[in-house]
């Protein structure tokens, strides 16, 4: 016998939980299908365990910096197994919360792997479920290239399973995941090498952030190799070797981490049985309202090819439920001006357009402001990472279309500035805001002279 629901969410990660929770709050009958622990990548092998370890790495840095401020810190060595055990207990508590919360909401939890039978019917381990509305929110998985010896490396999932600290690490990829793991491992004392196919780190970010990040990583002791095309991994008694297409060899690593992107978890869902369009890369295209090409079937989160960020999946899921069940027929997520943070050492953040993006989209109408400095946090230390900031402003009114920050506190300070950008704030609005002193964020409201005006060329390497 087939059980019928108002909504079925396939995937118990951020997006699936959000749409299921909201639909249940509207009194709808909801089923949630998941084969693993609730919380998805973010809770189990992503944002949450990463952030716990990021905090630990900053404590290690603080211990090293303490003597410069007259604080005699003792110890400072890392107990990796203890950190991992505490981290995993914390994740387990979050899993338990979600298990109980889903039950309290009256959501039917279905354990197993879902496959479409038709556009409104799902089969899970021999059990059939149907719904008026089905949401696909199955997230993604780390990519491992098909190269000789690729199995000698681990992914970010494997990193969070490590029971001992790796001592000499190669990270392949310089996106969010690669940069974040590089920073925290180096702060723990590991030797770290990052290789990337692109010609700069975090190539999708503003060039100022990429350049400052490279400078800070170099000062931290992280070795980088750009335009390095990995052809194979090899292993001998000395460890694992990275072999580039041009024959360059980097040798002697005890761990190699693949951080070259993520692929959508859409294989084996039987999407073809429902007639759901799937792109060659596995992404499920949707319109602005999360509709797929099949009425009553929706997709959200990483599988749609949009911003692969937890808050984006949550926001899209909640808005979808409001549209379907709360009479808000035009409710949808605005994907413009979504803020994001990379938890590097120090972190970097952005909202809006980079300078090259703004130039391409808006034309030669930009006024750009920049600053860089070493913050007071390192006033009594011999060295400290650089902070850098950029405002990208457009038109004669100088509407702020991009805010870019790297430095201590960048992760927390950007949220408020993101509200301002979303509301259409101008440079004059920033100027008319009284600064908080002393602090790094005040620089964003006290920038005076532009470094570039309309008609000025982009700086070299900023295209």
From Swiss-Prot:
Catalyzes the reduction of glutathione amide disulfide (GASSAG) to restore glutathione amide (GASH) in the presence of NADH. May play a role in GASH metabolism under anaerobic conditions as a sulfide carrier necessary for cytoplasmic sulfide oxidation. GO terms for molecular function: flavin adenine dinucleotide binding; glutathione-disulfide reductase (NADPH) activity; metal ion binding; NADP binding. Disulfide bonds join 42-47. Homodimer. Binds 1 FAD per subunit. The keyword Transcription regulation does not apply. Keywords: Disulfide bond, FAD, Flavoprotein, Metal-binding, NAD, Nickel, Nucleotide-binding, Oxidoreductase, Redox-active center. Belongs to the class-I pyridine nucleotide-disulfide oxidoreductase family. InterPro entries: FAD/NAD-bd_sf, FAD/NAD-binding_dom, FAD/NAD-linked_Rdtase_dimer_sf, Glutathione_Rdtase_euk/bac, GSHR/TRXR-like, Pyr_nuc-diS_OxRdtase, Pyr_nucl-diS_OxRdtase_dimer, Pyr_OxRdtase_I_AS. Pfam families: Pyr_redox_2, Pyr_redox_dim. Its EC number is 1.8.1.16. Ni(2+) binds at residues 2-4. It catalyses: 2 glutathione amide + NAD(+) = glutathione amide disulfide + NADH + H(+). One of its GO terms (cellular component) is cytosol. This is Glutathione amide reductase. FAD binds at residues 14-15, 34, 41, 50, 113-114, 302, 308-310, 437. NAD(+) binds at residues 50, 174-180, 197-198, 230, 261, 308, 341. It is an enzyme of class 1 (oxidoreductase). Its cofactor is FAD. The active site is a redox-active disulfide bond. The active site is at 437 (proton acceptor). GO terms for biological process: cell redox homeostasis; cellular response to oxidative stress; glutathione metabolic process. SUPFAM superfamilies: FAD/NAD(P)-binding domain, FAD/NAD-linked reductases, dimerisation (C-terminal) domain.
